[in-house]
Amino acid sequence: MIEITNYRQGAILNHNHGEETEKSLKVRIEGISDHGCPVMVNGMSAEMDGRRFSADIDLTEKINTVTASTITPYGNYSQELTLVWDKKSFKRYNFYIDDHIFTFTDLAKERPARAFDHFYLKGLKEIHEKYGTVFSLNCFYHNDHHEFLLKDMPDIWKSEFTDNSDWLKLSFHAYSEFPDRPYAEASAEEIGKDWDLVQNEIYRFAGEAAYIPPCVTHWVNIHPSAAQEMIRRGTRCYAGPLRLRVMGGPSLADRQKGGNMTEIQARSISGADRTAETLGLNLHYGFDEENNYCNNHRSYYDPLLKLYFYYNGVCCNLLPVKEIPGRVESILSVADKYNAETFGIVSHEQYTFPYYPNYLPDHMERMDLAARLYTEAGCKPVFFNDGVLGNTIWDK
């Protein structure tokens, strides 16, 4: 057996991992050859140290194949990995906000002269003007709290949305807030129908320039058929695994009627809302290797799906203001150790609205703070669905 040990399948590598020039990224490949026989890495002889081997190779493409092979008296063995060169990488962050329908409901009812006079859009624009933050607003078609359909959103502010589309994008999220996990058992046709409803309305009232494919669906969990349809429609990255899993957060009852947000946030911060109580349950429900890797490295690439998977780490509606600096500092510290440069912020629209049962008066302040902290850490705002998680150098 032979195994490359210092990089995972789909590892995203940047200038911090080796020596970068205009033409290549030179990185060291390390591993173990059980029989201690000579190893070749991409056709070059590796240095041997007992069973251990190492070799310096050049990554010259965005997507690179690395093959380690050995010939032994017992047969021939090889391993192939896909590594991504994040060329001219830079620290960056993506910010998406889920569950948008209240803003459109208000706009249709109030009809202000300018859409960005509405307190919510005005607040986001102020964050953008201070830090350059760009937002993806993931949208519902139906409002489950106050009867409204996205088809009833006026198009009188279309030029305004188009004019701001360089920093504010709208995307599909789900038909409506309820039920939970709407695409866990959905077919391609079912998610496609809902997707078309939302996307067509975005085109109508905001313009095609304001649209971006989603990097997450409602409750994240998604059926394989729905996932394939999502990828076919242009999704290039996803915030966490596609498969069904325990999510945590407010219960259905808490979200419908209101709950104790202090208690909900405390359970989220501690992890008690999603952690298995015993080792046996954790081994059954958990994917520790993937979780540990993403918590450290923040992202990886799946070459079969041609999809980038990444972790956020900061969900503003679940982190009180006093907890956000510590969370961001922890994420940045670990990322520096593992040479990671991609970060994510997420939140949910409804917590900004006084008439929502779980209203958080400081929700906009939380989002402002998260954006400011990543900006002060030298991170640039990007849309992860573009290029290599927001780095578009390979597209130029």
Residue ranges of predicted features:
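Surface-exposed, short loops/turns at beta-strand junctions within beta-sandwich domains
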Residues: D56-I63, P73
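Short, compositionally biased P/S/T/A/G/V-rich stretches that sit at domain boundaries
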Residues: M1-E22
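Aromatic/hydrophobic beta-strand junction motif of beta-rich domains
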Residues: V27-S33
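Active-site beta->alpha N-cap acidic-glycine motif
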Residues: E80-F161, Y211
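Active-site-adjacent pocket scaffolds in enzyme catalytic domains
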Residues: E147-L149, A209, N221-T342
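C-terminal domain-boundary segment and adjacent tail
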Residues: Y238-L242, T342-K396
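Metal-dependent polysaccharide deacetylase catalytic core of the NodB/CE4 family, i.e.
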Residues: V134-H223, R245-P250, E341-G344, E349-F353
